[in-house]
Amino acid sequence: MRRKKALIFGATGQDGSYLIDLLLKKNYIVHGVKRRGSSPNTSRLDHLYSKDSSRLRPNFYSKGSLTMHYGDLLDNSSLHRLIVDIKPDEIYNLAAQSHVKISSEIPEYTANVNGIGVLKLLEIIKSLKREKKIKFYQASSSEMFGNTLPPQNENSEFNPQSIYAISKLFAYNVVKYYREAYGLFASNGILFNHESPRRTYNFVTKKIINALKNIKEDKQKKLFLGNLYSKRDWGHAKDYVEAMWKIMQLKSPIDLVISTNSQISVKQFVNESCRQLGIRIKWVGKGLNEKAINLDNNKIIIEVKKKYFRDKEVNSLCGDFTKAKKIINWKPKYKIRELISDMISGLNID
């Protein structure tokens, strides 16, 4: 039986690394794409290799193979070369400027990477006349829903509240257009927030857990946060990459919401993280004056700062994965407590 070939853009990110894990276990020939930078970060892939070798760990990854390439969604020639040379069966586009707040500081870059980059990939597939030979997956975002009332599903109205969300909505619509106009197998996975030990420190969940651990160990005095009452549907990246793969195994392309059907606030995330870390806190004050006090020493360890609020807040995101459960037989395995526990364990490993 012929082994499938997958090409992954954004291979060194949180989702890319977990997707590589999954595909290698499924005996894929995997090609990952990373941007060339002054200090490229491939640490999320270190576990794939034997300590004293560049070869994959054979006992864990069977016959799967991984080759990394340099490329960039802003460089059309590199995209064209990769697709022509590799001839992939599946393309997963997980690459993005993914930080919502930063997107307003670099709007043109965000739009080019998140939006125009997707257009370039689909146009290359079409121009090579590989519409029937390549399956394309686009990582869409729940941020596209903005302040549309939850629960949000495939029929909910989009109402983007950031440059990031606007760029993602452009890409979402481009995928639909190329699918309907040219017959490409192009699917959108509308992913709600998903975290893991491999999440970077500039995302609020990792920021919270890392700071609280440091505070407990007297390595940090305070944690500063923005909107404590922003509610999100948080899942585990491991679950979500499985959904990506399942979407690509369908006979026809589709757009699906991937979520947990539940939500908690940033404040509740803090409370559960404190509970698991053994930090007893008490909240006092309101608004920008709200604070958390460590009951063991009466010191203020959490404060609210206006600079961490978004330009336009998205108050409540909660997905409905009913369609995904029906179409691809998917549901999340991790609950929020298990997710937080895994993230804390990941810090301990570090």
Predicted ranges, named:
Residues 1-196, 238, 244, 248, ...:
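N-terminal Rossmann-like NAD(P)+-binding domain of SDR-like oxidoreductases, especially those catalyzing
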